[in-house]
Regions:
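Ser/Thr-rich, low-complexity intrinsically disordered terminal regions
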Residues: 1-126
């Protein structure tokens, strides 16, 4: 862990998957299947995780995109983080792109928890 990571963890409470992220584990991922199929797999995975919960899942919009609102509760202090996921069609290639962001509900810094939330989510689909 470098100095910038420490400062970031004390001053930011948000992380997002970004194509330009220095860390390749914090980039959007592609998964085979339609947005609906991929959203189903995300839902199935969340249902197997004791500290994750599905708050809402929207119906596909006109472009087929599906939005999910998830939460993850930390173990020790039971802090709740909101994770917003978008599953979008990857240009009709038989795959979908998973985009997500994680936001702490409490505090000014997350000590890297939001990035860990995103890595945990995407790690299940890499």
């Amino acid at each position: 862990m470098n100095f910038q990571s420490i400062i970031r963890g004390m001053t930011q409470n948000h992380a997002e998957l970004n194509d330009k992220a220095d860390d390749p584990t914090l980039r959007p991922i592609r998964s085979t299947g339609s947005p609906s199929e991929v959203a189903d797999r995300i839902t199935d995975w969340v249902n197997t995780q004791s500290n994750w919960q599905i708050i809402s899942r929207d119906s596909p919009n006109e472009s087929g995109e599906i939005a999910l609102h998830l939460t993850r509760t930390t173990g020790l202090f039971q802090f709740v983080d909101d994770i917003h996921v978008r599953v979008v069609d990857d240009d009709n290639r038989g795959a979908s792109r998973i985009e997500a962001e994680s936001q702490s509900r409490v505090g000014k810094g997350d000590l890297g928890q939001n990035a860990r939330n995103l890595r945990e989510l995407t790690g299940a689909f890499r």
